[in-house]
Amino acid sequence: TATVDCSGYPQPACSLEYVPFCGSDNKTYSNKCDFCNAVADSNGTLTLSHFGKC
């Protein structure tokens, strides 16, 4: 299983860098910051499905 270290999130602002992550909700997040903020908002229910677009 792919994992991401989201310690230090959520962050108030994310860069526009595009390094896609596919979440367990089948949504593509544009980068680690966007993904980790969503993980923080989900109280840990969101996980990484795989690296890259969904």
Swiss-Prot record:
Domain annotation Kazal-like: ranges: 4-54
GO cellular component: extracellular region
Short name of any one Pfam family annotated for the protein: Kazal_1
The keyword Hydrolase belongs to this UniProt entry's keyword annotation: no
Glycan-bearing residues: 43
Compartments where located: Secreted
Protein name in UniProt: Ovomucoid
